[in-house]
Amino acid sequence: MKRKLASVFSVVAIVIASNGYVMAEGDMTEQKPMEIKVQLGDSSNAMRFYPANLEFETGKLYKLVLHNSSGTKHYFSSEGLSRSVFTRKAQVLGPDGKTIAEIKGTIREIEVYPNGTAEWWFVPIKTGVLNDLKCTIKGHAEAGMVGTITIK
C-alpha cells in the first residue's frame, strides 16, 4: 500500500513539475515591451483615438504610449481592459520625454492633458473583444472618441 501511494505521489510530482516547465517560456521579467502608440485627438481638436482599434496578445508586455496632441484634455478609459490586464506601472512624461511620475496598481482610466504623454505598461491576461474604449468627458464619446480593443 505504501509503495503504491509513493508511486502515485511520484507520478503526480513529475506531471506537476513537467507541466510547470512546459508552460514557462522564459523569464517574463526580462521581456522587452512592445510599444503601441495612441494619439488622443489631433491639432484640429477632432474627437478620435488614432488608431481606434487596438490589438494585444496575452502574456506579452506592452507599453501603451498615450499622447494628446489636441487643445483639450482627454481620457483613455476601458473598464474591460482594466479587468483584463496585469498592470506593471503607468508613467507621466515631462515635455523633455523623461519620466516625472510613476503610478503602481490598478489603472481604470488615464487622463492626458493637452500636449501631454502618459505610458501604461501592462500584460494582458484575459482574451476578448472589448467595445468599451472611450473618452469619458461629456460629449467626447458621442462625437466619436470611442474604440475597440481585441486581446488574443
Can you annotate each of these PLM segments?
Residues 66-70:
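Asparagine-centered strand-capping/turn motif at beta-strand->loop junctions
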Residues 25, 30, 103-152:
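Extracellular/periplasmic metallocenter environments
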